[in-house]
């Protein structure tokens, strides 16, 4: 957070418009993510709250694509997208690129070929997220470090309750940094 804020420096972002579309609001992790994202954009980077618009994709790619088209029509300065379907990234990227609007994909990574296309064609698009396999491995290591090693009832099997506890821990903002260490995050800039 400090690095991005430092990179922005003295630039006034208060009149810049940020369009955010989350694949679905009833996902607990993405609820915390979007709340923290809005807080970060407004409090740390200086975007005006009224210029940061977050919409619910409702688990429907057509609905989300319509939201993205509306953001483009309304000339938003940047879009931050958690796609319903990562496979829609090429079409969405092309729409944003044609409008001259940078796009940041979060949490659901477009495929490697698409990311390579951005670099090859000079497209202002990037992905910010974590390596899910590495995060899962790290969470498993955390369970193994507990006194019961996740076997709460002593039956020799990692209890589902331990898994729920890890999920709860992993979605609390204060524990995200511990459960998703810096080395797990990818940041590809444009």
Model features per residue range: what roles?
Residues 1-190:
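A residue-level marker of the well-folded mature domains of exported/periplasmic proteins
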């Amino acid at each position: 957070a400090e690095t991005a804020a430092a990179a922005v420096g003295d630039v006034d972002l208060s009149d810049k418009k940020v369009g955010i579309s989350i694949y679905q609001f009833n996902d607990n992790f993405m609820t915390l993510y979007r709340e923290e994202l809005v807080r970060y954009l407004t409090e740390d980077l200086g975007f005006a709250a009224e210029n940061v618009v977050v919409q619910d994709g409702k688990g429907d790619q057509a609905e989300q694509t319509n939201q993205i088209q509306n953001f483009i029509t309304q000339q938003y300065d940047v879009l931050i997208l958690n796609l319903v379907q990562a496979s829609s990234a090429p079409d969405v990227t092309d729409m944003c690129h044609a409008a001259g609007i940078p796009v940041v994909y979060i949490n659901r990574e477009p495929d490697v070929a698409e990311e390579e296309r951005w670099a090859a064609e000079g497209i202002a698009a990037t992905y910010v997220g974590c390596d899910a396999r590495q995060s899962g491995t790290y969470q498993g290591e955390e369970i193994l470090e507990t006194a019961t090693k996740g076997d709460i009832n002593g039956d020799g099997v990692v209890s589902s309750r331990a898994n729920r506890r890890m999920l709860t821990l992993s979605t609390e903002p204060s524990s995200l940094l511990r459960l998703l260490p810096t080395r797990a995050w990818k940041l590809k800039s444009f």
